[in-house]
Amino acid sequence: MSTNTPSVEVHEFETIDRCRICQNQKVDLILDLGDQPPANCLYKQNDNPPSRVPLRIGRCASCSTIQLLETVNPEQLFSKYVWLTQTAKTAVNYAEVFADRLEKITTGKSCSILEVGSNDGTFLKVLHRRGHKVLGVDPAVNIGKVARESGVPTVSDFFSVNLARDLVKNHQKFDVVIARNVLPHVSDLHSVIAGIKESLAVDGIAIFEFHRADMILEELHYDSIYHEHLYLHSLKSIENIANRYGLLAFDVDESPISGGSFVAYFSLSVLAESPSLKAAREHESSLQIGSLDAWQRFAENATDHILKFRNIVVGAISENKRIIGFGASARSSTLLNAAQLCGDHILAIADNNAWKHSLMTPGSAIKIVSFDEALSLRPDVVVLLAWNFKSELLAQLKNAGFSGEVIIPLPGSPHIELI
């Protein structure tokens, strides 16, 4: 077990010596984004900043899984969390779409539903309102309290095969088990997948949503690399581990979350595979999704992009323009630290989550403020750090009367748009 230099919160971490999925000992380095604090470790202005941990991804030479080379103690990352699903209108609206799709597959029957990593219960609230019996599991004690206060029963714990057995004993097997943007966060993925199988009724359905590696690769989403995301999952890599536990994919949908995600549907029996599932597999194959060459090109392009992004921001500073950021997301932390941008460049970062206000961003040390307070600084330029919510955030800026330059870091090449 390694630790970093002393600070108020020293982050314990381990460097892996083998693949987390297949245990092969050859995991090749792909991209090194330097030493960075864990992305959601916001801190008070008068406190010492959080410690830094290497942020590197590699590729298993055997099973091709793309994964972080360091594992930060999950208790330090997830026991107290600052991301609330309900603060993003895109996610709230998508919850209704997600429920529609689920009910189409379950043919409208009332189901018992377990969600792993249920956050504030936004998705389960929609399903409960539609007549389903719901239960959430989430390790963040503070967010579990929010969920329970809103009427969503939630167990505050890390999901595992042992917890799954307890849930089944105290409740029942579930018709549907959902894991949305959870599987990339889990070091012992075998225990979680085994637990999902353990929780699932014989004719049940497991639904896995994850930021899709083909889009990460094609659109250069290197900012989705941070210490909470231990994997960059493809459909291929998800199927690889799910199949080991008898879970078989039969359909796939797309989701707007994280700038583009897959929603894959699995069952314990062989079901007819949808055309969209076959098309997704073919697309990943055409990209050589697991190849070392593809990810080495990704790393080269990411390195070039970081420099271009920094130059745009520094160029605006040289013209005496006042700059704020919008969206103190986890991915913004990777982006800012990789580009070595800080409070000397960006006056403040606006965020719609009140829990983050008055806190400092890790590494870049920029104050997070309310949207109104950020606009009161009279910015000439807004850096759209949470670019994956572009439509929502641009609409908010326009409605507030902002007129000026907006730097769009991703996807693709960083560029400026005028509004």
What are these regions (language model features)?
Residues 2-90, 253, 263:
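N-terminal juxtadomain amphipathic helix
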Residues 50-146, 221, 226, 294-314, ...:
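Extended interfacial segments that mediate partner engagement and assembly in macromolecular machines
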Residues 129-162, 348, 354-357:
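Class I SAM-dependent methyltransferase SAM/SAH-binding core
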Residues 178:
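A conserved beta-strand element that flanks and buttresses the S-adenosyl-L-methionine
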Residues 190-205:
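A short glycine-rich, Lys/Arg-flanked "PGG" loop and its adjoining helix->strand segment in the class I
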Residues 203-211, 405-409:
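Conserved beta-strand signature within the Rossmann-like core of class I S-adenosyl-L-methionine
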Residues 208-231, 235-238, 242:
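Short, glycine-/aromatic-enriched active-site segment of Class I SAM-dependent methyltransferases
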Residues 258-301:
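Flexible, glycine-/basic-rich loop-and-beta segments that form/coincide
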